[in-house]
């Protein structure tokens, strides 16, 4: 049933495949590299795969889209836009320098590179191929990524001891005296906190931006790359399945198997 549907609706299946590929592209396009900065320090964000002087680079900030422009590098000239929110500088090496950062600097920064240099053709980039890279900057007092703290519950151990004592006098009347002594021992261990240690973070961030790492946990950049790899693998699998169904390979194999088994030739309904 599925084979017949795909055979009779090839165009719809192809459109659906194109939509899936476009959605995956948008997801990968909007994925940003996490970067952390400490209040009062400078943070440098680097453009990637730039070959001066023909390549052009644009820096902007803001969530989604083109955002607000900061710098434009065109050949040997640099254009800097006035901005009252940030104190920044456009460096000659196509990098963006954020000066004396505060929590207000915590936002998304994007760089778009127009690869016009002929050397990019070696990598099959083609003409006017653009490479977009974005950084998700987080600024705090420690200059480290937020860590989680777990608190163990307090345990109390109670121990009770009972002692019985009998006293007898010289009279004929015997008096039994029972004394109960209770001793209670309380054990109150101090609560333990498991806090992941802070790691040093390099503020000069490029394409190989390194995020703060915690013990037994992958870094945010590794998680970022792993997510990209999974999306690419999913797209490749979907494309392979669509190609197999588009050329009716399962149906042809089924007819070939019927011919070898029964010695008859079956004509598919799509060829009638």
Curated annotation (Swiss-Prot):
It comes from Human cytomegalovirus (strain Merlin) (HHV-5). The gene is UL11. The keyword Transmembrane helix applies. Plays a role in the modulation of host immune response by modulating T-cell function. Interacts with host PTPRC/CD45 and thereby reduces host TCR signaling and T-cell proliferation. This is Protein UL11. Glycans are attached at residues 42, 93, 100, 142. InterPro entries: Ig-like_dom_sf (IPR036179), Ig-like_fold (IPR013783). It is found in: Host cell membrane; Host endoplasmic reticulum. Interacts with host PTPRC; this interaction affects T-cell signaling. Glycosylated.
